Amino acid sequence: MTSIAHERFHAVAEEPAYARENAPAVSRSAPAAISLTGLEKSFGGNRVLRGINLHIPAGQFVAVIGKSGCGKSTLLRILMGLDEPSAGELHFEDADGAQASPNARIVFQEPRLLPWLSVADNVVVGLGDGVDSRAAAKAAEAVLAEVQLGEKTEEWPARLSGGQRQRVALARALISRPGVLALDEPLGALDALTRISMQELINRVWRELGFTAVLVTHDVSEAVHLADRVIVLDEGRIALDLPIPHPRPRRHGHPGLCELEGRLLAAILGTDGGH
């Protein structure tokens, strides 16, 4: 039977986590490196992931793109401990290369806010149990200010726009200051201008906090704008692993970025042979 080196770590599916440098409730988690070797996933007779070999250095921002059904979200769920691989190995490593169990959080396309809780109380959910209530409230206030919702702490989720609700979901993920943050199509339901604003926010908090980030998206432009590296999946295999060498901040429409987008689209459509 194939060994699955995958220690269960603290990943709250509904709530991500982060907070400001001076927030008293938690300390910043060290980013973790991620290594996949021969990773497979099947549902019945359907092989969704086929021999995935991938190393993500600590602190890197990686985007995963591809056609619907290529295995993107399945890969992310396995990374976050929400699903088990059928075969292969998954390791998280600390700065010394030793196996680690990182503080990891995930943000979904649907914010999944609790309607009976205020914005601040929704964010506090991301801390889990055992945190002093005053410290938790202070941390929530700080992280909401960081995502530019400092004036919405006592608001109800139903009164927020779609973009504001997604900012709350991001704050909930960030309040625990994760070492790994997964983003599963987090901007897919937002309008174009709100998406750009959220991209800038995600880029900023990633640069400030230094966590390892894995983004799943259908948007090639979004992937190129945010990631250090873009992985194209095709029928469960890695078809292209493309570095994005451009300095940050990146301007939408930059000719060099447009060229990279073209290469990625060709790989998705299968018109470049994966090269």
From Swiss-Prot:
It catalyses: ATP + H2O + aliphatic sulfonate-[sulfonate-binding protein]Side 1 = ADP + phosphate + aliphatic sulfonateSide 2 + [sulfonate-binding protein]Side 1. Keywords: ATP-binding, Cell inner membrane, Cell membrane, Membrane, Nucleotide-binding, Translocase, Transport. The complex is composed of two ATP-binding proteins (SsuB), two transmembrane proteins (SsuC) and a solute-binding protein (SsuA). Part of the ABC transporter complex SsuABC involved in aliphatic sulfonates import. Responsible for energy coupling to the transport system. Its main location: membrane. Its EC number is 7.6.2.14. Residues 34-260 form the ABC transporter domain. This is Aliphatic sulfonates import ATP-binding protein SsuB 1. Belongs to the ABC transporter superfamily. Aliphatic sulfonates importer (TC 3.A.1.17.2) family. One of its GO terms (cellular component) is plasma membrane. It is a peripheral membrane protein. ATP binds at residues 66-73. It is found in: Cell inner membrane. It holds the Pfam family ABC_tran. One of its GO terms (molecular function) is ATP hydrolysis activity. PROSITE patterns: ABC_TRANSPORTER_1, ABC_TRANSPORTER_2, SSUB.
